[in-house]
Amino acid sequence: MRKSAIIPALIVGALLARVEAGDSSPQLADSLERKVAHLRENGQKARPDPRPTVLTDEEVDAYMNSGRLKVPEGVSDIHLSTTVGEATAVAKVDFDRLLRDVRKNNMLWQLFTGVHDVKVRCGVWGKDGMGNVHVQNVWLDGHEIPRVALEFFLEHYIKPKVPQASLDSRFRMPVRIHTATVTKGKTTLTQR
């Protein structure tokens, strides 16, 4: 299974903790990489080991900022934190870099310029092999964007290019992950 297939599980396992930059970041990113490799290998077995795999917010945060995961150009300084059933992501978004090629095709994109703080809070859970992500709130520079505006933007400008895009996503979790339980500071994944 490709690394990119594990990303939905990481999101469901969600993640988002502010980690102080320090000497432990490479070790934390390595730890997450080993856990992802274990999940992949375990998922290929006829009878996967059902013991849980715990992903800490700190590991996910270190991995997301290590350069090992391809993120869109213009998105940086990603931080994740989890509480019971929720994940919150914060990132710096340079809209000039992110929308460089799209802007010329649509006037609406010209409204987005400069570097901004974007924060997204989601309800996340996984049960019976299905992952669920429900976007609850989105903030731009501390100002909450009304859901109706998010829905309009998604419907008219994102879905034509990415038909599966949604504020409420349900998907089969990869590598035979059966449950994803999100609690304070960690996500626990079990496989079947």
List each model region and its residues.
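Bacterial N-terminal signal peptides that target proteins for export
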Residues: 1-7
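Intrinsically disordered, low-complexity segments enriched in polar/charged small residues
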Residues: 7-8, 45
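Bacterial N-terminal signal peptides
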Residues: 8-15
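Extracellular/lumenal and peripheral-membrane lipid-interaction modules
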Residues: 18-192
